[in-house]
Amino acid sequence: MAKIIYLPLEHIDMRYTVYLDKVITNYLESSKIEFIKIYPNIPKREIKEGSFLDAPTTIEFKSKQIAKVAEMYHTDQIKSGDIIFTSDIWFPGLESIAYLNYFCNKEVKLTGFLHAGSFTDTDFVRDMERWAKNFE
């Protein structure tokens, strides 16, 4: 039976990320859906005033999630039919899933929420459209 590999956002107390992870985890558990949650242990760092995240910490967190996913492909813990779900698809490095699917000869689906992006005029990542539009 297919399972979900859940890649949550890192917890940032002043944002919605802790609540969102709790809601998603509770739903998966109460629905008795088989899932593996990949939540790397990284040190909490202070977010600079005027920012809503710390970019280096975010990239470290997501990179460790992708590294764990790659290990799971290598050890055949991820199988065709499984689903990788992320609570935010705006996730640099997520294109690695297509790479892993191709070279590991697996059909693993990728899904998740896309809260905003370079296509959103009011989002700060609008300035990243030059490279982000092909990623999104």
Residue ranges of each PLM-predicted region?
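Active-site proximal beta-strand in glycosyltransferases
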Residues: I83-W90, Y102-D123
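N-terminal pre-catalytic "stem/leader" segment of glycosyltransferase-like enzymes
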Residues: M1-S96
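Membrane-proximal helix-turn-helix segments that form the acceptor-binding/catalytic region
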Residues: R126-E136
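Short, solvent-exposed loop/turn segments at secondary-structure boundaries
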Residues: Y16, D123-R126
